[in-house]
Amino acid sequence: MSLQMPIPRKKALTVSHFSITLSLFLAFFISSTSASTNEVSALISWLHSSNSPPPSVFSGWNPSDSDPCQWPYITCSSSDNKLVTEINVVSVQLALPFPPNISSFTSLQKLVISNTNLTGAISSEIGDCSELIVIDLSSNSLVGEIPSSLGKLKNLQELCLNSNGLTGKIPPELGDCVSLKNLEIFDNYLSENLPLELGKISTLESIRAGGNSELSGKIPEEIGNCRNLKVLGLAATKISGSLPVSLGQLSKLQSLSVYSTMLSGEIPKELGNCSELINLFLYDNDLSGTLPKELGKLQNLEKMLLWQNNLHGPIPEEIGFMKSLNAIDLSMNYFSGTIPKSFGNLSNLQELMLSSNNITGSIPSILSNCTKLVQFQIDANQISGLIPPEIGLLKELNIFLGWQNKLEGNIPDELAGCQNLQALDLSQNYLTGSLPAGLFQLRNLTKLLLISNAISGVIPLEIGNCTSLVRLRLVNNRITGEIPKGIGFLQNLSFLDLSENNLSGPVPLEISNCRQLQMLNLSNNTLQGYLPLSLSSLTKLQVLDVSSNDLTGKIPDSLGHLISLNRLILSKNSFNGEIPSSLGHCTNLQLLDLSSNNISGTIPEELFDIQDLDIALNLSWNSLDGFIPERISALNRLSVLDISHNMLSGDLSALSGLENLVSLNISHNRFSGYLPDSKVFRQLIGAEMEGNNGLCSKGFRSCFVSNSSQLTTQRGVHSHRLRIAIGLLISVTAVLAVLGVLAVIRAKQMIRDDNDSETGENLWTWQFTPFQKLNFTVEHVLKCLVEGNVIGKGCSGIVYKAEMPNREVIAVKKLWPVTVPNLNEKTKSSGVRDSFSAEVKTLGSIRHKNIVRFLGCCWNKNTRLLMYDYMSNGSLGSLLHERSGVCSLGWEVRYKIILGAAQGLAYLHHDCVPPIVHRDIKANNILIGPDFEPYIGDFGLAKLVDDGDFARSSNTIAGSYGYIAPEYGYSMKITEKSDVYSYGVVVLEVLTGKQPIDPTIPDGLHIVDWVKKIRDIQVIDQGLQARPESEVEEMMQTLGVALLCINPIPEDRPTMKDVAAMLSEICQEREESMKVDGCSGSCNNGRERGKDDSTSSVMQQTAKYLRSSSTSFSASSLLYSSSSSATSNVRPNLK
């Protein structure tokens, strides 16, 4: 018998408690293990959600692990549950979509997947991760909208979604993130308004929403409730309206960055209450009114950038009390009054930029207290008086731009104290006195421009010490003495222009040591002696101009070694001897002018080996003799030939092959024989042929005689002929009466027949005038005028593509029918005013590499045909807007087209006599050749400037819709400046990829108004924005030139010659600036989005120096507005 002992009650309770505890532990363990397993599964699933294998750095992610806590980039909680609290992946190229099962991570506090090429949309499930404190998904390729479910995250402190492709609005639900401190959503494609609900987040310290070009509306007044806000960045958006007064409540605000937007109204004086403000960036807006003096209370402000607004009035003295300021930029406004003397209190000031205002008075000497000043730019104002010698105390000064003012007196010797000076431009002032020798002791000086002053004295011998010089321009002064031999020490000099002075003595041999020289202009001085043989060592020289001096001796044979030379101008000197045959080796020569010398001998045949000689060959006013060599016909591209006032003899048959000649002068020689029966000779006037007694035209025994005996003989012949003429007159009158009756009958017949035939081929003989050597006939052309060959229609006619029997393809423009007189000499002289006569008159007289080649014309009663070279790539308009591959039109090609078109238009305006106004510049009238070279075409509305009715109203609208200059609407006047405006519109079209009136431009704005409002890199064609920084810089500088061209005031627009010069120097200036800055701040090859970066704002700065048509700005302002490292420091991209 067994006895069962009873269990005590206390022990039974203990066993029961243990059992419950064990059950709970097991349940928790199983639950925790299950959660960890789910997280492992979720991470592995995400890692393999792409077809590409995951990066090797994720090899430690083992799907067999029970939890991911030991995996790279993963952090778990310290408790026993081992749940993921952090996912931190930065700068690893994942190329994965956003984690689809993000809600699996219930304890996640920090989600950082930045700069990993994360794709897809942000899942709304992210709002279920209620523990999240930090979300950083910046610098990826995310698309779609920002999930409104983020508003559920009450613990969220940082939300960084910047630099993605997010669209849609900023969700108002973000206002429910009551713990949010940093909101960074800049550089996306967000739109609509900034939610006023953000004003509910009292913890907010940073709002950065810039770079969203469609973000619009006003800055909400409620932002003033975010009392902890330190950064407000809304740059490069469409934010409009006024700055809210409530911003003055933000006492902790450190950076206000709302540049390149559509802000208007006045700067609120309440900003003076933001006592912690460090950066105030409001440039490139439409702000108006005066600068509030209350800003003077901002003792912590370091940078105040307000350039390119409409601010006016005096600059308050109180600004000088902001002792922390290191950068002030008030350029491109309408400030008046003087430079405040209180600026002398700004001991930390590094940059003071006041360019392009209406500032008067003198430069305060007290600015010398600003000992840290690096840039001082006061150009394009009305500043007068002396340059204070105290400026020389600024030891850190790099750049001093004071051009286009009213400065007077001497350049102070004390400027030599600016030991770090790199660029000094004081052009277009009233400076006198001599050049300070100390300037040439500055070992960092690269550019010295003193154009158009009244500087006298000699060039100091110390010039040889300034070995850093790249550009030296002393044009149009009163400098005397000799050119110092020490100039030969300037090994970096590429541009030397000493023209229009009173220099004397020889051209120094030592100048040949400047091996980098590309341009040497010593013209319009009184230099004597020989031209140095050693100039041949300047193998990079492109322009050599020593005209209008007193140089003697022979032209050196060694000039033939200058293989890069394209312009050689030796005119108006006393050179003797023969023309060296070695010049034939200068194969790049386009212009050769040896006129007005004492050159003798024959014309060397070797000159005719220069195939590029297409602008001019001028050998006039010399003592050349002999025959014209037959080989001269090889210069088939030559436009101007002047061999007048020599002793040349023989016949002129050799000249008949020069089919492209526009101007020919053979007067005052000893030519004989008949004039060739070619176009250029038929167009010569008497003054261009006179003085050749033996020269005759076919059908006459003598044509150009001028001695008295021959004139007496002519009088006798004339008397005899007069008697015969009277006898014939009676007979002819009777015949004409009969013919008159027949003509009336015939006219009625023709009118009736004309209604049945557009061409009237059977009624009127076709007239054919070729301007080139053509291998086809009118009949060949007419056969091609069928509907299937039409390639375009315009306001002046239809354009056909025509293939000739010899497989040559040409373009034929058939002008719209209009009955006009036959274009015989009589009607030409009377000035027919239709598109045919205008275009023939214009195109037949010009030659330029960027103007479409006019082959010839043919016409009859009412059909008029113009023939051109056919352009295989069509027009610029079709390239930009009608082809799917527009993005493949790279910057190099676009720049080439812009520059070439400018050069062609400059030729029309400045090199044609008389000047020619195109009147219809547009993208469709710029044709594109096989190598993407541009050609200006369609002169259907062209008028010559000296036409009597040129400036009066025209019955035909001059120009095309979208391109017409604004002054035409009220004055109906067309000038060269009208062409400049139209060209500016074309440049905007090329840069933006948009048409002048484009449906994609918001609010129906014209491209000009749109660009002026945006004025940022955002206007650049999307296909170009990813180009290297150096190219983007060139685009923005080109945009600055375009803004000059579209100035609403015609007088303030540059000439096309200046435009072409500016564009030509953009690349060159950038290269030189890299030398100046040591590649500081401008040699980066890329842009890391989201970091402080100066690219776009530096480009904005370029525009402000493009406001003057001064020739000096192209040599300095373009460079120093865009490449200075100091400038870069004050253009942060705080979006």
Swiss-Prot record:
Binding site for ATP: I791, G792, K793, G794, C795, S796, G797, I798, V799, K813
Cross-referenced Gene3D superfamilies: Phosphorylase Kinase, domain 1, Ribonuclease Inhibitor, Transferase(Phosphotransferase) domain 1
Extracellular side: 36-723
A Pfam match: LRRNT_2
Positions of the record's site feature: Essential for autophosphorylation activity: K813
Record-listed E.C. numbers: 2.7.11.1
N-terminal signal peptide: 1-35
GO MF annotations in UniProt: ATP binding; peptide binding; peptide receptor activity; protein serine kinase activity; protein serine/threonine kinase activity
Region Disordered, annotated ranges: 1077-1135
Biased composition (Low complexity): 1108-1128
Reaction(s) this enzyme catalyzes, per UniProt: L-seryl-[protein] + ATP = O-phospho-L-seryl-[protein] + ADP + H(+); L-threonyl-[protein] + ATP = O-phospho-L-threonyl-[protein] + ADP + H(+)
Cell location: Membrane
Lineage: superkingdom: Eukaryota
TM segment ranges: 724-744
PROSITE patterns in UniProt: LRR (PS51450), PROTEIN_KINASE_ATP (PS00107), PROTEIN_KINASE_DOM (PS50011), PROTEIN_KINASE_ST (PS00108)
Homology family: Belongs to the protein kinase superfamily. Ser/Thr protein kinase family.
Role this protein plays: Together with RGI1, RGI3, RGI4 and RGI5, acts as a receptor of RGF peptides (e.g. RGF1, GLV5/CLEL1/RGF2, GLV7/CLEL3/RGF3, GLV3/RGF4, GLV10/CLEL7/RGF5 and RGF10/CLELN), peptide hormones which maintain the postembryonic root stem cell niche by regulating the expression levels and patterns of the transcription factor PLETHORA (PLT, e.g. PLT1 and PLT2). Links RGF peptides signal with their downstream components.
Protein name per the record: LRR receptor-like serine/threonine-protein kinase RGI2
Organism: Arabidopsis thaliana
Gene that specifies this protein: RGI2
